[in-house]
From Swiss-Prot:
It is an enzyme of class 2 (transferase). It catalyses: (R)-4'-phosphopantetheine + ATP + H(+) = 3'-dephospho-CoA + diphosphate. GO terms for molecular function: ATP binding; pantetheine-phosphate adenylyltransferase activity. Reversibly transfers an adenylyl group from ATP to 4'-phosphopantetheine, yielding dephospho-CoA (dPCoA) and pyrophosphate. Substrate binds at T10, K42, M74, R88. It is found in: Cytoplasm. Its EC number is 2.7.7.3. The gene is coaD. The keyword DNA damage does not apply. It comes from Edwardsiella ictaluri (strain 93-146). Belongs to the bacterial CoaD family. GO terms for biological process: coenzyme A biosynthetic process. GO terms for cellular component: cytoplasm. The record marks H18 as: Transition state stabilizer. This is Phosphopantetheine adenylyltransferase.
Amino acid sequence: MSRTAIYPGTFDPLTNGHLDIVTRAAHMFDSVILAIAASPGKQPLFTLEERVAMAREVTAHLTNVEVHGFSELMAHFAQRQGANILVRGLRAVSDFEYELQLANMNRHLMPTLESVFLMPAEAWSFISSSLVKEVARHGGDVDAFLPEQVARALMTRLRDA
């Protein structure tokens, strides 16, 4: 039986912390879908298409990882993809309460959907896409927190904005 996991998020932009989680998930499961949410309510800096393209570029070396955009309920997307494992990253205890609520709602919507929580490597445990964008907006160096291609795209987007 093949085990397909989904690692969902907005990934605006995809950080080294996200890359750490998807890489580790790729070693744990037969296949992983990096599912990029449209998330229009969050007003992403990058379009869904741009986020999907960047994610495909930085995960190209992970042969069992596919990247898809989605705009429906996660449980419905998981069902459509034939996946019953949801991978989520936990950086701090403060993430846990929200993730617990999401896991319970997803299980209510799809009883066979299990949530698996991974902690990022310590080097990435304090990073969030929002924090990285804020640092970059104020002229800080974010190269250590993002894959090279993503850092370039972020700096170009902010410069051209």
